[in-house]
Every structure is written in C-alpha cells, then in structure tokens.
Amino acid sequence: EGYWACRGGGGGNFGVVTSFTFDVRPIPAISLFTLEWPWPAAAQVLGNWLEWMPTTPDELWSNCQLLSSGSSTPEIKVTGVFCGMPSTLSGLLQPFIADVGTTPIDNFVGPEGYLKAMLIEGGCEGSTVTECHLPSQNPLGTLSRSAFAAKSAYITAPLPDAGVGTLVGAVESLAQHVPQVGGGFVFDSYGGAINRIPADATAFVHRDALAAIEYSVSWSADTPASVVDGATQWLAGAQVDLAPYARGAYQNYIDPTLEAWQQAYYGTNLARLVHVKRAHDPDDFFHFAQSIPTSLDP
C-alpha cells in the first residue's frame, strides 16, 4: 500500500525516500521540433493541436504554448520530442501544419543527443549539466531564481471554439495590461502509456486526460507590488476562464490558493491515500498545508 501511495501521492506525505533503483532502457534516436506562428493564428493553432495531438503515436510528445513574454505581442508555439528520425517526425507534423493554414515563422526539426535534448527541455539550452544548477547547489551553476505563481488543470476533450477564444483573449489581456511580467498557458500532451494505466493502479488518478494545462505568471525581484498584484489577479481570472472546460489539478504544481484541492489532486484515490497515511504516519509527522490528512472528517 505504501508503494502504491508513493506513485502519485508521495510529495512528502508519508516519509523520506532514501534510494531509488532504476530499470534503464537503451537511449533511442531523438528528434526535437519547434514550430512558431504569428500571433493572429493562435486560435487556429491551439484548436488544431488539440485535435491533432491525440492522433499521434506514443513516440511523439508535444506541448502548445500561448505566452506573453514582456512584449505587446504574445507568442504561439508548438514544441516537442520524438523518439525517432527527423524525416519521420516531419511526416507526422506536416498534416498539422497544413491544417493550421498559416505558414510558421519558425519551423525547426532536427536530431539531437538524448542528454542535450533533456537539457533543452529542462530550460538549459546552451548550458552544461554543471551549469544547469543554482550557485547554491553548485559553485559553477549559472541559474537564477525567479518568482512565479502557477495553477494547473486537466482537459479530457478538445476545447470548443469559445474556450479557445477565451484563452487567446486572456493572454492578449495579460500582454496588454501587465506587460512587465511573463505568463500564459502551456498545454502538455497526455494519452499514450499514461492513459493505459487504470486510475486506481497507482495513486496518480489523472488517467483520462487529453492534456494538462499549466498557467502561470512570473516576475523579477524588483517588480513593484502593484504589478505582482495585477499578475496574480490575472491568474485568478484565468482559473475562472478555464472552469467550464477543465477539472482537477496536477499535484506536483502545488497551488496554495486551490479550493477543494484534495479532490482536485487525488480524486477517487483520496480515501485510499488517507487510509495509507493513517497506517504509515498516524501522528501526521509529515504535515504541510496541503498534505494528505489522517482523516476525511471536517
């Protein structure tokens, strides 16, 4: 039961993991891609991505990003990783690009070594593994901290046109009214092996999702409090915008403002997790604001 709970319900709830044993796999050929369109194509790109992505093979993972990055014009990108050759990847991407109907302003498809691909996906393009650390973690680390606030949700079906338009408008509003911060929506593809595992086989209950959505805002240390307040208000408004179309939340994107977080994170697995908590940590030693409780009583 403890092993079941730690696969999707861990996160400091039951104890401290002291070691891991990995079943390593051969490293496959890896191809990366980045597609970017002019912002006026954003609604078409997101709508088509939501329809195209579930048709792709397990070897392809992608995300769709609608982001404001401090300029008056937001960005719309689709990026991803493919376990296979660039020529095969290009063939998978071509129908999607054609259906969008607007020529991308960036269309990169290329092979990459696995380690470098993971550095790029981890936000460390151009850095070594050593440099991809905070200086407090490694003296040669070059990363710096930034402040952010984030929320998450899941969708189990493509958004209707009205929902797509609402999110595109929300990013435009962020760029117009709070241009000093970065932020927006990132859709991460699910499906494949994730969804073939039953919802109760592990503590991770989100097994029917089409995509996970992370929506966030970030700012620098010297950002005025009034700007930060505007950014967090935008985030709260984005949650309202998504509410008709999305449900749940990803427990690794812990959200201190999330209401009904127990159900959002754990769904139908919550009662079993509480039972495991009561058995392994009856005194609630591993306690934090959103830790699994020892009882479901109010």
Describe each PLM feature range.
Residues 1-298:
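Soluble FAD-dependent oxygen oxidases
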